[in-house]
Amino acid sequence: NPDEKLMLVVEGLIKEGFEDIIIVNDGSDEAHMQPFKEAAAHKEVTILTHEVNKGKGRALKTAYEYCIANRPDIDGVVTVDGDNQHRPADIRKCCEKMIDNPDYVVLGCRDFSGENVPAKSRFGNNVTKGVFRFACGIKISDTQTGLRAIPAKYLDFMSRIKGERFE
């Protein structure tokens, strides 16, 4: 369920020049609809709705499928969580890197070295990045980032990955 941070994300993206913002309402209840109503008032925003919560994985797939069907000429998509943890300028940088490198998925990464980072978050990220490196042979500093720039040619594949909840 979103809060006022969703509008901070939307307004930041619009100020940064993004003109096609897709938001998935993943089964939010009536008490949490105001942020979606406010976002929908912007011409740059399209709201896609799940009547019941289906999970982050399904929400992402819904957006990918929408883009495949309705935005065939895009370079790709940038996924951003609705909690305003990513700066619009960093979102733009990821988008530009993806456009410059259309064979690669670009991941934003958070700084886990600060004193304000909960030990649980730091530990969880260290475990998952170690598992990812062991399983895939690739070093990624933030495996749980919500900031991803994905070239359009990978959207069909991404929409068919097994799992719906963001396993």
How would you describe each model-predicted region?
Residues N25-Q34, N84:
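A conserved acidic beta->alpha catalytic loop
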Residues L60, P72, V117-E167:
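Conserved catalytic loops of nucleotide-sugar-dependent glycosyltransferases that act on lipid-linked
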Residues N1-K15, A31:
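Short, well-formed alpha-helical segments that are part of the catalytic scaffolds
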